[in-house]
Structures are given as structure tokens and as C-alpha cells.
A protein has these predicted regions:
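A structural motif corresponding to the C-terminal end of an alpha-helix
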Residues: 41-50
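Short, small-residue-biased leader/transition segments that mark boundaries at the very start
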Residues: 2-5
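Residues at the starts of beta-strands that form the adenosine-phosphate
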Residues: 9-10, 49-51
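Conformational coupling and interaction surfaces
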Residues: 33, 37, 50-188
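Active-site glycine-rich loop that binds ribose-phosphate moieties when present
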Residues: 10-41
Length: 188
């Protein structure tokens, strides 16, 4: 419990949002919405800054039909597997956001943990709403109204192409140069 979170040098969280809309309510990101009390507790009690890999950056990581097709060319079995497990998300993102593709949130948090050059942002005090209509919303005090010590690094920018190179290289084992060449053709 308390011991588990206090002894960490670094903490990367795939959750929250700064300026982006929510993905399970108008304002909340799903992970924080599921257990807002836990998210708030961690933000308020961790002794190191939380790297918030929120919807502001994860929404920029879109598995497009072209990338999905490329995955199937790289490895038919793995590509088909990815296609099958993302079908729900393709439908969700089309219905609610009119995006042709699938936002793949979680892999960005892992990639950022491995390579901090992928994302950038700013430090701020962050908390999480635990009640009412905005339950689960991450509240980022970007303008320092509360004059509280910064407890987070809120990520707002991501190098989408470099993420995709890293992701495809790690999952499919192809050379980064080969992947970059193809991605130049299929990523706008």
C-alpha cells in the first residue's frame, strides 16, 4: 500500500488528460475514471513526479488501416491477431470520434518509459476528481493557481512516427530503417 508507492524513483502513468476530451465521459480518461480515489491518492502521496501519459498524447497514436495492413504484411499471424483485438476500438473511435483507426493508448506509456525522447510536456500540480459529474477527471493546474508543488510531468507532445518505428520494430522484429521507409509512405 503506502510503502509500495513511496519508494519509487520514477512513475509513468497511462491515464488522465490535460486538454483532450475524455474517452468514457466528456472529461475523464478510462483508467482514472475506473478508480479515481486510487489515482488521486497516488498523485497526492507519491514522492516523485508522475509522468502522465494521458489522452493528449495517446490520441496522436493511431493504428490506421494502412499501418494495420503493413503489420499483416510483416507477419500474417501477428497482424491478424492485432486486427482482431482492435476491431472493437476501430468501431468505438469511428462512432464517438469519427476517427478511421484505433488509438492505441497503453503501448505509448511503455515506449515512453523506455525512451523519454518520444514525448515532452511540462511540470504541474495534478489531482483527480473523485465525485460528481466529472468523476475521474484529471485536473492539471497548468497556471499554478493553487501554488502547490508540482507533482507531475504532463505530456503534451509525441513523435508519432518514432513511436510507431519503435513499436513495429519491437513487435515484428524488422529493421528500424525498413520500417521508417514504409512509414514515410503510409503516415501523413
Amino acid at each position: 500500500s503506502e510503502m509500495c508507492i513511496r519508494d519509487r524513483d520514477e512513475f509513468v502513468s497511462m491515464g488522465g488528460s490535460y486538454k483532450s476530451h475524455g474517452n468514457c465521459s466528456p472529461v475523464a480518461e478510462y483508467n482514472y475514471w475506473c478508480d479515481p480515489d486510487a489515482a488521486k491518492y497516488v498523485y497526492e502521496n507519491l514522492r516523485t513526479k508522475i509522468h502522465m501519459v494521458g489522452l493528449d498524447v495517446t490520441r496522436k497514436i493511431v493504428l490506421t488501416p494502412n499501418i494495420l495492413e503493413y503489420m499483416q504484411i510483416l507477419d500474417t499471424e501477428k497482424g491478424e491477431f492485432v486486427k482482431n483485438i482492435t476491431r472493437f476500438y476501430y468501431d468505438f473511435h469511428w462512432e464517438y470520434e469519427r476517427v478511421i483507426g484505433c488509438v492505441i493508448n497503453d503501448p505509448l506509456a511503455v515506449a515512453y518509459f523506455l525512451n523519454r525522447e518520444l514525448c515532452s510536456g511540462f511540470e504541474a500540480y495534478t489531482t483527480v476528481e473523485t465525485e460528481g459529474i466529472s468523476i475521474g477527471q484529471s485536473v492539471v493546474d497548468a497556471m499554478n493557481f493553487w501554488k502547490k508543488e508540482e507533482n507531475s510531468i504532463v505530456l503534451t507532445e509525441v513523435d508519432e512516427k518514432e513511436f510507431m518505428v519503435m513499436f513495429l520494430h519491437r513487435v515484428f522484429g524488422k529493421s528500424e530503417q525498413e520500417i521508417r521507409t514504409i512509414l514515410r509512405q503510409i503516415m501523413a
